[in-house]
Each structure stands twice: as C-alpha cells, then as structure tokens.
Amino acid sequence: MIGIDIVSIARVERCVKRFKMKFLERFLSPSEILLCRDKSSTIAGFFALKEACSKALQVGIGKELSFLDMCISKSPKNAPLITLSKEKMNYFNIQSLSASISHDAGFAIAVVVVS
C-alpha cells in the first residue's frame, strides 16, 4: 500500500510558535524532536511522513495507530527512515516500510510504501 500527505510549512510554524513543545510532543518522540533542530520544514516533513504512514496502513491516526507508534530516523546518507514498534509491525503484518520526504513552495510532502 502507498500513503501520501502534504503539510503547509507556514501552518506548522504557527503551531510551533503558539504551542511550543506541547505541539511537538503530541506527535514526535524526544529523538525525533532533536533531529528536527527547530526547523519548521523538517517538522512539517515529519508530520507528513507519519500521516502518510497511517494512510498507507489504511487506519489513520487513532485507536489502531498513534503518532508515537511510528519512529522516524535518518539513514547514513540522511534519507528519512520510518519504523513501527514491533507490536505494530506484527499487528499490521508489515515486512518493510519505505519513505520519502520533499519540500517545495512552502509545503512538505511525504510518501510511504508498506510491503
């Protein structure tokens, strides 16, 4: 399955400015927050990536999958990687996840392929 999501970077900037860490902690782990380094485009990309993953799994964010069930990291070449907890990998019967994030014209877009 494939999931895709697009997020306005300006909207993320407004949320960070208004809600500070409370906004980030709602959908990012401490290690993911460190990866973002307060960069709005990266935060928007990470949000889009988690939303795209939930769409690829056809469940959205809710009872079956929370933002914190997904973990974003970077490959040695700085490409985004997304993983799920072992429990969720088994629950959804996932063998692998592939991810891509791009930024342009004030938007962050992410795609996740689940196999």
Curated annotation (Swiss-Prot):
Its EC number is 2.7.8.7. InterPro entries: 4-PPantetheinyl_Trfase_dom (IPR008278), 4-PPantetheinyl_Trfase_dom_sf (IPR037143), ACPS (IPR002582), Ppantetheine-prot_Trfase_dom (IPR004568). One of its GO terms (molecular function) is magnesium ion binding. It catalyses: apo-[ACP] + CoA = holo-[ACP] + adenosine 3',5'-bisphosphate + H(+). Pfam families: ACPS. GO terms for cellular component: cytoplasm. Mg(2+) binds at D5, E51. The keyword Aminoacyl-tRNA synthetase does not apply. Its cofactor is Mg(2+). Its main location: cytoplasm. The keyword Cytoplasm applies. Keywords: Cytoplasm, Fatty acid biosynthesis, Fatty acid metabolism, Lipid biosynthesis, Lipid metabolism, Magnesium, Metal-binding, Transferase. One of its GO terms (biological process) is fatty acid biosynthetic process. It is found in: Cytoplasm. Transfers the 4'-phosphopantetheine moiety from coenzyme A to a Ser of acyl-carrier-protein. Belongs to the P-Pant transferase superfamily. AcpS family. This is Holo-[acyl-carrier-protein] synthase. It comes from Helicobacter acinonychis (strain Sheeba).
